[in-house]
């Protein structure tokens, strides 16, 4: 399991701390562009690279803050993850008021909620992997995604 952590450059420290916590406390791998030398590409090359990296992940966690309002990449990465039918959640580290389009997905505002997210993510991924043994890819992915959203919203009180 691997999570693509989408963030605006101003939120790099928060995104890195999230990636570290996911790994240290939950052994969940993540993709974070600050440690990727390829992320210095420009334009179409960068877009292609991000698509490739998203293709290696299972879901997207968007780190949002006041600075995200000026970002073009975070909404674009969310759009690519939506096309891929990946589970999506947001992390508002500075208690940022989320724009309407982000309220569609579960949102996290603390390390405790990040831990809940990690546990639910692992469980949904296990469901996906187990279902893939006897169901096709699309049905398995949909089942895991539905479980992810239902359980995470329920545990966060966002039902």
Positions of PLM-derived features:
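Switch/connector loops and helix/strand junctions flanking conserved nucleotide-binding motifs
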Residues: 40, 71-72, 97-102
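Structural motif
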Residues: 59-62
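Conserved TIR/SEFIR loop-to-helix hotspot centered on a Trp-containing motif
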Residues: 66-84
């Amino acid at each position: 399991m691997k999570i693509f952590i989408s963030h605006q450059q101003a939120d790099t420290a928060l995104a890195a701390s999230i990636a570290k916590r996911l790994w240290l406390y939950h052994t969940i791998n993540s993709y974070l562009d600050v440690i990727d030398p390829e992320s210095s590409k420009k334009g179409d090359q960068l877009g292609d690279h991000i698509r490739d990296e998203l293709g290696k992940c299972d879901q997207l966690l968007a780190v949002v803050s006041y600075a995200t309002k000026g970002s073009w990449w975070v909404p674009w990465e969310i759009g690519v993850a939506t096309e891929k039918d990946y589970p999506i959640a947001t992390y508002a580290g500075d208690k940022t008021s989320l724009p309407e389009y982000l309220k569609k997905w579960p949102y996290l505002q603390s390390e405790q909620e990040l831990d809940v997210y990690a546990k639910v993510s692992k469980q949904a991924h296990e469901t996906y992997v187990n279902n893939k043994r006897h169901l096709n890819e699309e049905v398995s992915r949909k089942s895991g995604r539905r479980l992810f959203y239902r359980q995470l919203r329920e545990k966060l009180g966002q039902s």
